[in-house]
Design a protein with these regions (language model features):
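Active-site and substrate-binding clefts of carbohydrate-active enzymes
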Residues: 11-220, 230
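Zinc-dependent metallopeptidase catalytic helix centered on the HExxH motif
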Residues: 1-5
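Catalytic and substrate-binding regions of extracellular carbohydrate-active enzymes
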Residues: 163-167, 175-374
């Protein structure tokens, strides 16, 4: 927070209130987490305490960090020498635990900061090396799913829990959550290694999940399939599945499910809405040879998408030229939409870390499309 580019953080000692409503005693030091042990730093640390009227004590760290070697003999000797210089604030080498124990005595008097501790800098790290963010989040979900399936298989007496393999895969994921890998601010070679790690992670998770699904659903009916809900809440949402040859629809409890039969380059598949599948459970559906119930369908052409609610028109570059609301009989698009743009990205410093406030002022619309497909 000391590197905010617009607003100075207002407190040193405070209670941070999270979105859950819980309070945590916090301290924002005005000096960096690494540096020298000298007179200037001692005064900077002392004078930076904005709550000195509540607790007249400050906290600072010294040494070479971020891959350095910590404190040096010279720093420790200087710390002893500063104790004998008149006018220099009294210092003592201690620990963060002892510091927080001391200021905790006055914590009820601290101001409360309610909400996100937003860092006004390094906004580019939300998008840099996007494949890392994508694989990280997918890996977190898949690891949880693998743990659920492994636990279920063990509880049902079908196989042992794969603790060792899950630990190995978790460690691959966690290594790549290091604070420079995940934001996208590492050097190029790091991301070559990260791609290899994620490939190994994805292979391992796919193998483990498929093994557990095969164990749990070993007595499968070739005319049936099970939709599994890994969430801890009931799930309602779209399900897409390939249709075996000769089948046209899906049924549950001997009732036809409204669905849409679609096709792509890989063959025919069915799309339907699975409603209220219980948490951490599943529901088995059956393929049916009956024709699927008629559903209001989307009309899709080269320059048109239309259903019973909206009519959306596109030009030959893929830009939206019209959105017509059929229910209210009115046009709702004021100007051309879906314009694809690239923007000039020349941050003042740390190019992988930052986006400047004014980047939106330099758009370059991509007006000519080689091909457009709806």
């Amino acid at each position: 927070l000391c590197a905010n580019d617009t607003n100075a953080f207002p407190h040193s000692m405070f209670k941070w209130r999270s979105h859950s409503g819980d309070d945590v005693t916090a301290y924002f030091t005005r000096v960096s987490y690494q540096g020298e042990y000298d007179v200037g730093r001692v005064f900077e640390c002392r004078n930076g305490n904005k709550q000195s009227s509540i607790a007249d004590i400050s906290f600072g760290m010294f040494g070479y960090g971020d891959g350095g070697s910590g404190s040096t003999t010279d720093m420790l000797e200087r710390a002893e020498a500063l104790k004998n210089i008149p006018g220099v604030p009294e210092t003592v080498n201690s620990s963060a635990h002892e510091f927080f124990d001391e200021i905790g005595k006055k914590a009820d008097e601290f101001p409360v900061y309610d909400g996100e501790l937003y860092f006004e800098n390094h906004r580019g790290t939300f998008t840099s090396q996007a494949f890392v963010k994508k694989n990280n989040r997918r890996g977190e979900f898949a690891l949880r799913n693998a743990e659920i399936l492994s636990s279920a298989a063990e509880l049902m007496g079908k196989c042992d829990y794969d603790g060792a393999e899950l630990e190995r895969l978790w460690k691959i994921l966690l290594v790549n959550q290091f604070h420079d890998i995940l934001p996208g601010s590492s050097i190029h070679e790091v991301y070559e290694n990260a791609r290899e790690d994620y490939a190994e992670l994805n292979r391992g998770l796919e193998k483990l999940i498929n093994e557990k699904l095969n164990v749990l659903f070993s007595e499968r009916d070739p005319e049936a399939f099970t939709v599994v809900n890994y969430l801890n809440v009931p799930y309602t949402g779209e399900v897409k599945i390939k249709l075996p040859e000769g089948y046209n629809s899906v049924e549950y409890a001997d009732e036809q499910i409204p669905c849409a039969k679609l096709s792509d380059k890989t063959g025919d598949y069915i799309s339907f809405v699975a409603e209220k599948i219980p948490s951490l459970s599943g529901r088995t559906y059956r393929f049916s040879k009956s024709e699927h119930p008629t559903q209001p369908c989307v009309k899709a052409e080269k320059n048109l998408l239309e259903n019973n609610i909206l009519r959306v028109e596109f030009d030959n570059n893929g830009e939206i030229t019209s959105v017509f609301d059929k229910k209210n009989d009115r046009e709702v698009l004021a100007a051309v939409g879906n314009t694809l743009c690239i923007y000039q990205d020349k941050p003042i410093h740390e190019s992988a870390w930052n986006l400047e406030f004014d980047y939106r002022m330099t758009p370059y619309p991509l007006k000519t499309a080689e091909s457009v497909e709806v």
